[in-house]
Amino acid sequence: MLDQRLVRDNPDLIANELGRRGMTLDLTGLQLIAQQQRNLEEQRSSLQAEGNRIGKEVGQRIQQGSDPKASDVAELRHQGNLIKQKVAVLEDEEKQLSARLREQLLSLPNLPSPDCPEGRDENDNQERHCWGKPREGKDLLEHWSIAERLNLFETERSVRIAQSRFVTLMGQGARLERALINFMLDLHTSKGYREVMPPVLVNTASLTGSGQLPKFAEESFRCAEDDLWLTPTAEVPVTSLHRDEIIPADQLPLRYAAYSPCFRREAGSYGRDTRGLIRLHQFNKVELYWFVHPDHSQAAHAQITADAEAVLQALELPYRVIELCTGDLGFSSSRTYDLEVWLPGAGAFREISSCSICGDFQARRSAIRTKDQKGTRLIHTLNGSGLAVGRTMAALLETGQQSDGSVLLPKALVPYFGKDRLEPE
């Protein structure tokens, strides 16, 4: 969430910065609400000061010997009571305005970083670097064809169980998924991340705090009778691990590696990636999440991206790093690097991780602060997939496919899977 004082006092700045995202905004209404709230706050503070003055005067007169029931003292007390009533009315009006203001602020995305490249959409994103040599060939299969040959997952039966865009991993497929999760978690925890396995059901406050609500309500699965939603990413519950907390600066950074199933309705993606593991309603992911001091967030962004890259490098999967332009940024992000893994069968790069710096955007929504010698201020947060497990499996199948129908696995994964290849059963 944006700083309401900044919106109130510098609406042109906010409009210009969000214009870099391709948004056209009229902040007049929001600015008016913010100014009304400020005026009420000033009136309330003035009345409270007057009430305090009257209270002190009553106390002084009684100490000086005045009768507590004397008319002058009674009149002062009456004035004090009237002020309390006026303050109560103003506080109620303030609460109503605050709710309206917060509702509007929650709908505004984060401001893009000054370092973020300008652009309208994904066509203006910029490649930063590549790693590995992409495998190419005319006869290479896409991952779902390989999976069918090896009987790695069930699609048709999953539709019977649930609906489309679900899969049931079977045999070697389930085993490989489990191996990948354990490998990713072990790699990250060996670098100092603390492992987290959070709830997969989260409340509205958690989704609001991370930035998924209110904008992405249609993308999420919601329980009918409870204030609970299926989490779209572990970023949501991990953000709220420290909601309404003050974290001492000497405890930062806090670095978490969280595995969770993720659930997304994928509204608006009809007809896209209907086969295989790329776009599912339910998938597994290992999420990296940092709480950092505001002075260190830029360096942390480089590191969290490198940590996500380390998984791809260990698995010998060629990839490229793309920096998103201002028009393609996610709602909560101020700057993002996407990691795109090469899929030889598809002959294309596909996103497998987004590593984003959110500044104080999520912290303001979630009231997460830090305290040092300079005082108390909002913390900065960062997140990155480390990695999306299903897409990693897809890349492994396409990269390791052999002419005999088997799939050769990278050496780093062999201790977790138990052998060096997938073979027809």
UniProtKB/Swiss-Prot annotation:
CDD domains: SerRS_core. InterPro entries: aa-tRNA-synt_IIb, aa-tRNA-synth_II, aa-tRNA-synth_II/BPL/LPL, Ser-tRNA-ligase_type_1, Ser-tRNA-synth_1_N, SerRS_1_N_sf, SerRS_core, tRNA-bd_arm. Residues 43-68, 108-131 are annotated as: Disordered. This is Serine--tRNA ligase. It catalyses: tRNA(Ser) + L-serine + ATP = L-seryl-tRNA(Ser) + AMP + diphosphate + H(+); tRNA(Sec) + L-serine + ATP = L-seryl-tRNA(Sec) + AMP + diphosphate + H(+). Consists of two distinct domains, a catalytic core and a N-terminal extension that is involved in tRNA binding. Homodimer. The tRNA molecule binds across the dimer. It is an enzyme of class 6 (ligase). Residues 117-131 have a biased composition (Basic and acidic residues). It comes from Prochlorococcus marinus (strain MIT 9303). GO terms for molecular function: ATP binding; serine-tRNA ligase activity. The keyword Cytoplasm applies. GO terms for biological process: selenocysteine biosynthetic process; seryl-tRNA aminoacylation. It holds the Pfam family tRNA-synt_2b. ATP binds at R264, R265, E266, E351, I352, S353, S354. It is found in: Cytoplasm.
